[in-house]
């Protein structure tokens, strides 16, 4: 029995977006969904109870960072990541590939894996498909990611073709090295940049290996929005309709809606938590930079249309004061609000799919959020 299964509930008649449910060893979650990122086994400033209160049923943790600190052996000794961090929902771990490949001046790619230097102390390290599986098996996440090559954007066709072929070979090695297929599902990652033929080749290679789910990688790496949307449009049809599809590293409201319309089920990004620590909040009318001086005497909530406990109890003036004074509680409030906002947005997306009106929802949301043509960057 596969530990990860996908149930397609319905498709939206306006857009073709999918309403579904993913079942894991640590519970089920409805899709499309957004996954908060807990890089170091914590979503910064949030407790597990905070995340449960906003109906976050799956979170993401980072293999590379947990390998370096505290080390996978300590987490294995603790009984796995769920026990270590007291989280009883589902956990997805990335493979560490993105972090290693982002150390472009500190790494060397070979067929066996990647040689690179620890960003903390300069120590020489080596990460391979086998090592990435070993670490993730020790962490015990519900969903593991294959170790892939993450090419830069833009990249020449020939470079990208060689990269796709290596990613396919590494995916096979990941499957062979995966020691816990009975209780951890391993997803393959489709690469290929903006080249349709290479996306097709990558998807077909991975689908032939019969992973329980598929990620679309190599997007949200600096390409324009229209390129991301175009790539999704020609990539998702190559993926099986009875398995979940995960768009990696995407978390702006417009990209979540556009991704869902193009058949994506799962998203993750540090965006809502990172901008929260800069005093930037997502609201139904676009971004609000609460640290700005104009909010010093503004006793309204961050978003009057928001039902989260932050908006019910705290004013912009108070939150601005906390952030200006570098008080952790201020970052906690903005983080809670932003995550609640995105999780609520995905709930609205699911309701719109259920009612066959996601196209209409997108139009009204984009207009109110300031994503019309006059102000396309307000995300």
UniProtKB/Swiss-Prot annotation:
Entry binding sites for substrate: 94-98, 148, 191, 218
GO molecular function ontology, one term from the record: metal ion binding
UniProt pathway annotation: tRNA modification; tRNA-queuosine biosynthesis
InterPro entries in alphabetical order: ArchSynthase1/Queuine_TRR, TGT, TGT-like_sf, tRNA_ribo_trans-like
Source organism superkingdom: Bacteria
Functional note: Catalyzes the base-exchange of a guanine (G) residue with the queuine precursor 7-aminomethyl-7-deazaguanine (PreQ1) at position 34 (anticodon wobble position) in tRNAs with GU(N) anticodons (tRNA-Asp, -Asn, -His and -Tyr). Catalysis occurs through a double-displacement mechanism. The nucleophile active site attacks the C1' of nucleotide 34 to detach the guanine base from the RNA, forming a covalent enzyme-RNA intermediate. The proton acceptor active site deprotonates the incoming PreQ1, allowing a nucleophilic attack on the C1' of the ribose to form the product.
Protein name stated in the entry: Queuine tRNA-ribosyltransferase
Gene encoding the protein: tgt
């Amino acid at each position: 029995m596969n530990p990860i299964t996908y149930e397609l509930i319905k498709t939206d008649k306006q857009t073709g977006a999918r309403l579904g449910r993913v079942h894991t060893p640590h519970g089920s979650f409805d899709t499309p969904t957004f996954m908060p990122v807990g890089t170091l086994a914590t979503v910064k400033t949030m407790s597990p109870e905070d995340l449960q209160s906003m109906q976050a049923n799956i979170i993401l943790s980072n293999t590379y960072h947990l390998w370096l600190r505290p080390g996978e052996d300590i987490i294995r000794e603790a009984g796995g990541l769920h026990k270590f961090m007291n989280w009883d929902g589902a956990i997805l771990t990335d493979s560490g590939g993105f972090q290693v490949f982002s150390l472009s001046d500190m790494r060397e790619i070979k067929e066996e894996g990647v040689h690179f230097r620890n960003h903390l102390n300069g120590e020489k390290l080596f990460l391979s498909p086998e090592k990435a599986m070993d670490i993730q098996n020790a962490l015990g996440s519900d969903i593991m990611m294959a170790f892939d090559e993450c090419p830069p954007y833009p990249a020449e066709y020939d470079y990208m073709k060689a990269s796709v072929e290596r990613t396919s070979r590494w995916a096979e090695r990941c499957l062979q090295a995966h020691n816990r297929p009975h209780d951890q599902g391993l997803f393959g990652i489709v690469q290929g940049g903006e080249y349709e033929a290479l996306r097709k080749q990558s998807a077909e290679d991975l689908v032939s290996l019969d992973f329980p789910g598929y990620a679309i990688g190599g997007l949200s790496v600096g390409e324009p929005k229209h390129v991301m949307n175009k790539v999704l449009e020609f990539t998702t049809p190559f993926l099986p309709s009875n398995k979940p599809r995960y768009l990696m590293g995407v978390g702006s409201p417009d990209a979540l809606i556009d991704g869902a319309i193009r058949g994506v089920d799962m998203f993750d990004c540090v965006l809502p938590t990172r901008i929260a620590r800069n005093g930037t909040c997502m609201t139904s009318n676009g971004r609000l930079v609460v640290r700005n001086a104009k909010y010093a005497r503004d006793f309204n909530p961050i978003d009057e249309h928001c039902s989260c406990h932050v908006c019910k109890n705290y004013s912009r003036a108070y939150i601005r004061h906390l952030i200006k004074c570098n008080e952790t509680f201020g970052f906690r409030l903005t983080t809670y609000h932003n995550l609640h906002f995105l999780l609520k947005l995905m709930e609205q997306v699911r309701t719109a799919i259920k009612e066959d009106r996601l196209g209409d929802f997108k139009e009204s949301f984009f207009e109110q959020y300031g994503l019309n043509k006059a102000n396309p960057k307000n995300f």
